[in-house]
Amino acid sequence: MKVNPFVSSDSGKSRKAHFNAPSHERRRIMSAPLTKELRTKHGIRAIPIRTDDEVVVMRGRHKGNTGRVLRCYRKKFVIHIDKITREKANGSTVHIGIHPSKVAITKLKLDKDRRALVERKAAGRSRVTGILKGKHTDETVN
């Protein structure tokens, strides 16, 4: 059952919104999860991917390959990774596009703005988990 009457559950409208999304919304759509080590270190689960992040491919034909993000191609919702290429019929090599949800970030490129973003997300997440943590004790639960 639909909870919010102002949000459409029409799949066609959802797809239209996704594929006609402006660039700043595509940035958020193109988020990638962090590895377990980074997740515990920074206290966040996922972050929008950017050039110069180091990633490992988690799904598909190139599973297990690691590399640096060369380009975030927002128009096609893909990223290009430095070591993942294929040879064309004319002999030239091209980078293969991979969706950011199919990779995990192993090393973040942190500048001052991105560090602030990570800290802001971690603070909000810790506030929410702090509220939920310890809500029920063994005595209150039968």
Swiss-Prot record:
Region (Disordered): 1-24
GO cellular component, as recorded: cytosolic large ribosomal subunit
SMART domains: KOW (SM00739)
Keyword Cytoplasm carried by entry: no
GO molecular function: RNA binding; structural constituent of ribosome
Family listed: Belongs to the universal ribosomal protein uL24 family.
Residue ranges with Polar residues bias: 1-11
Gene Ontology process terms (BP): cytoplasmic translation; ribosomal large subunit biogenesis
Highest taxon of the lineage: Eukaryota
Keywords (A to Z) from UniProt: Ribonucleoprotein, Ribosomal protein
CDD domains listed in its UniProt record: KOW_RPL26
The protein, known as: Large ribosomal subunit protein uL24
